[in-house]
């Protein structure tokens, strides 16, 4: 059995097995998590300069910012097997 990767936009992929949660960046607690990750060097910005629409928390305490909607990332995680399509 191979490692399953999820496309989070613009050709960026993350390991599906290591995702803890996928959330919207709008709430104050999530903004604090993003700032803490930035200060500790564990923030990965995969937005390519676009608006952050999803925040992905990994089991390694890394925080990944994506410009893809959280629902889209979740659908890619639990939905289709074709994970290389851009959405």
UniProtKB/Swiss-Prot annotation:
Entry-linked Pfam families: RemA-like (PF04025)
Family membership: Belongs to the RemA family.
Name this polypeptide is given: Putative regulatory protein GWCH70_1057
Entry coiled-coil feature ranges: none
InterPro entries the record matches: RemA-like
Disulfides per UniProt: none
């Amino acid at each position: 059995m191979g490692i399953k990767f999820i496309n989070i936009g613009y050709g960026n992929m993350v390991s599906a097995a290591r995702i803890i949660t996928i959330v919207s960046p709008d709430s104050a607690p999530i903004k604090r998590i993003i700032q803490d990750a930035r200060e500790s060097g564990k923030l990965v910005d995969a937005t390519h300069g676009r608006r952050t629409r999803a925040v992905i928390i990994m089991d390694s305490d890394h925080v990944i910012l994506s410009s893809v909607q959280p629902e889209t990332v979740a659908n890619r995680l639990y939905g289709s097997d074709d994970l290389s399509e851009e959405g």
